[in-house]
């Protein structure tokens, strides 16, 4: 349901990611349908895109991340540390109420770190 595409300065795709379990971890129905089991295992889309780039030795410094939702604080930290300079997500994204405080904090983090946040 959630994806991330990271593009370089020439708008070339540098990396992609989606919400899912780490390599080698079975994504069976029992785990996927139980939040208590799923959430500790899941890698967020932004994390997967960053880790994929790192795995193949590709820097994301100066890149733009296009994401399905505003990033959570966990992903905001990773985007900042990876050197991403802009985050773009759809305008009018309806964020579930339980995530609003986390998304507000992540927006503050991205802003304080000097990243551009754009709703498109």
Give names to the regions the model predicted:
Residues 1-120:
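Zinc-dependent deaminase catalytic domain
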């Amino acid at each position: 349901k959630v994806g991330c595409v990271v593009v370089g300065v020439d708008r070339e795709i540098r990396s992609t990611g989606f919400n899912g379990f780490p390599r080698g971890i079975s994504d069976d129905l029992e785990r996927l349908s139980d939040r208590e089991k799923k959430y500790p295992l899941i890698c967020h889309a932004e994390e997967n895109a960053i880790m994929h780039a790192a795995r193949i030795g590709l820097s994301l410094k100066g890149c733009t991340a296009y994401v399905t939702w505003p990033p959570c604080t966990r992903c905001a930290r990773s985007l900042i540390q990876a050197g991403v300079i802009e985050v773009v997500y759809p305008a009018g994204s309806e964020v579930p109420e339980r995530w609003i405080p986390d998304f507000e904090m992540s927006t503050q983090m991205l802003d304080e770190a000097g990243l551009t946040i754009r709703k498109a």
